[in-house]
């Protein structure tokens, strides 16, 4: 069994997991797709089933509780819960329990309430274990992506989940930064990359610069509530108004209408509602463009902020994320690029680029092929004496970064250090990150010098410390807002099969009917070769149709 270091793009609607082993990229495929729906079904027996298999699972045959929207709840707390509820408008129960969001999923014969952290942990454990079992690998490290616009609370929540996994995590990487690592290796002739990451629920843009072996994130912008889900909702509202539909259009049909309208000339669609009723609708490419336009315009405004701020006149806009596949999105961004002297690249791997970048970064850093430097997403300010906000970490700033403020202990003082994250000029509208009580006599004698030390780590997490400049002793200040990062342990069973397991089962069944398939039995322990040999015969779907023709039970 070979060791592997994994790259995970944990997305709002779809996730992708990959690993680079001996310069070959291995990707988990479920249902013949590398884009695994970010949803999970939990059964009464404790089985966890993810992706498309969870979406189509019948409640009559297998009672379960169905969860989705996991990423949209990351880092939501008492201060942001109402805002998140208004944005997400969940069709399931979401509630705060001691400052943490718990979800009660869609009841399909079974109901259970779990924390968002428990659900995300179960999903990540399952998707990574399926990758490992597919290629007979042992996971020894993980890089996971997060939206560049994530604030400290969201990054802390993400890191607490990763710390609880059964395998180690190296780092959290901003999604556009991960994509940039991949595209820098694919397009070495460019020095500046604007990574346009339009996903299912979030939008990010990052400006990446390359100089020799240095790859640095220069600037970033984003919106944690702008993505494909907004386009789906716009399509739903449009169809409801056009046909006076009184029922909720299932999300799967909205996604299907959007995808087929974009990729084919089809304009007539049939919607099957949850109650079994049917509605035929007409939806054209021009109507798709009308629904998409407002959201792309919002994304272009964010791109332009980065372009203008950095006086960018050359480079490439590299499109990433599932929503970037939409033709109206590409057309509008291409039109914008032409006005700024930029080149648009819509790569065939745009949906996988973030995961691939996370995987590639392991190798590049291990071999010291590049020096990768990220930057912060939001400025930080300290509300000190007289309630005057003092910027301590501007945006953009290369991270990790340490800011030191030297002070002299002239007299004993009791005060509070308050740190806010955000760029709103009205400071209370920003995120209140840290509130620490300080008694200066705890850290220095009268007459001694001491320093406030603000540490911003590679994952975007801030820590406040006091250093006595005479003794050199460092004190980490407790944060009154700190929440426990412990996740209530709950163990789920992995009963789901990977594509490789499916192929082995299918080949065994075919071998019963046709002895020619017995030659594949010896390949069950070398899954990559098995997959290649089966692909030569037309792939899983072709062989499955062949089995159905041999046995009516299939």
From Swiss-Prot:
It holds the Pfam family HSP70. Its main location: virion. It is found in: Virion. PROSITE patterns: HSP70_2. InterPro entries: ATPase_NBD (IPR043129), Heat_shock_70_CS (IPR018181), HSP70_peptide-bd_sf (IPR029047), Hsp_70_fam (IPR013126). GO terms for molecular function: ATP binding; ATP-dependent protein folding chaperone. Keywords: ATP-binding, Chaperone, Nucleotide-binding, Virion. GO terms for cellular component: virion component. Belongs to the heat shock protein 70 family. Transports viral genome to neighboring plant cells directly through plasmosdesmata, without any budding. The movement protein allows efficient cell to cell propagation, by bypassing the host cell wall barrier. Two movement proteins, p6, Hsp70h and three structural proteins, CP, CPm, and P64 are essential for cell-cell movement. Also plays a role in virion formation. Together with CPm and p64, encapsidates the 5'-terminal portion of the viral genome. This is Movement protein Hsp70h. It comes from Lettuce infectious yellows virus (isolate United States/92) (LIYV).
């Amino acid at each position: 069994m070979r060791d592997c270091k994994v790259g995970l793009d944990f997305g709002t609607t779809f996730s992708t997991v990959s690993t680079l082993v001996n310069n070959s990229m291995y990707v988990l495929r479920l249902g013949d797709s590398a884009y695994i729906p970010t949803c999970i079904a939990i059964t009464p027996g404790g089985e966890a089933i993810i992706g498309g298999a969870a979406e189509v699972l019948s409640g009559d045959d297998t009672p379960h509780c169905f969860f989705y929207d996991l990423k949209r709840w990351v880092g939501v707390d008492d201060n942001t819960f109402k805002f998140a509820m208004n944005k997400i408008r969940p069709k399931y129960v979401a509630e705060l329990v001691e400052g943490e969001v718990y979800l009660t999923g869609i009841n399909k014969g079974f109901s259970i309430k779990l924390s968002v952290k428990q659900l995300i942990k179960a999903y990540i454990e399952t998707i990574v274990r399926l990758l490992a079992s597919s290629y007979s690998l042992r996971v020894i490290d993980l890089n996971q992506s997060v939206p560049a616009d994530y604030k400290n609370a969201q990054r802390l929540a993400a890191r607490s989940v990763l710390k609880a996994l059964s395998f180690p995590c190296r780092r959290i990487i901003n999604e556009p930064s991960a994509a940039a690592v991949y595209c820098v290796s694919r397009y070495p002739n460019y020095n500046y990359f604007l990574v346009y990451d339009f996903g299912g629920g979030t939008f990010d843009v990052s400006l990446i610069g390359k100089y020799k072996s240095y790859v640095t994130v220069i600037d970033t912008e984003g919106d944690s509530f702008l993505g494909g889900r907004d386009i789906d909702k716009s399509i739903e509202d449009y169809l409801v108004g056009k046909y006076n539909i009184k029922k909720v259009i299932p999300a799967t049909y909205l996604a299907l209408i959007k995808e087929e309208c974009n990729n084919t000339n089809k304009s007539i669609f049939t919607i099957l509602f949850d109650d079994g009723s049917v509605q035929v609708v007409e939806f054209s490419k021009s109507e798709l463009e009308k629904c998409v336009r407002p959201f792309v315009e919002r994304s272009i405004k964010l791109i332009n902020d980065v372009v203008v701020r950095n006086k960018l006149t050359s480079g490439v806009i590299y499109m990433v994320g599932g929503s970037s596949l939409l033709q109206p999105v590409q057309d509008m961004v291409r039109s914008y690029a032409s006005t700024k002297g930029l080149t648009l690249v819509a790569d065939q791997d745009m949906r996988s680029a973030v995961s691939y970048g996370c995987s590639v970064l392991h190798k590049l850093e291990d071999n010291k092929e590049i020096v990768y430097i990220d930057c912060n997403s939001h400025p930080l300010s300290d509300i000190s004496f007289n309630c005057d906000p003092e910027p301590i970490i501007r945006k953009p700033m290369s991270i990790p970064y340490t800011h030191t403020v030297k002070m002299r202990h002239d007299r004993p003082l009791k005060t509070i250090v308050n740190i806010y994250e955000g760029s709103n000029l009205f400071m209370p509208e920003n995120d209140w990150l840290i509130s620490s009580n300080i008694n200066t006599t705890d850290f220095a004698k009268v007459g001694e010098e001491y320093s406030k030390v603000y540490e911003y780590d590679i994952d975007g997490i801030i820590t406040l410390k006091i250093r006595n400049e005479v003794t050199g002793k460092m004190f980490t200040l407790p944060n009154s807002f700190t929440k426990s990062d412990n996740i209530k342990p709950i163990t789920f069973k992995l009963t789901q099969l990977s594509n490789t397991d499916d192929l082995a089962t299918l080949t065994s069944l075919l071998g019963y009917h046709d002895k020619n398939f017995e030659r594949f039995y010896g390949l069950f322990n070398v899954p990559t070769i098995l997959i290649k040999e089966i692909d030569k015969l037309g792939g899983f779907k072709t062989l499955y149709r062949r089995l159905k023709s041999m046995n009516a039970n299939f």
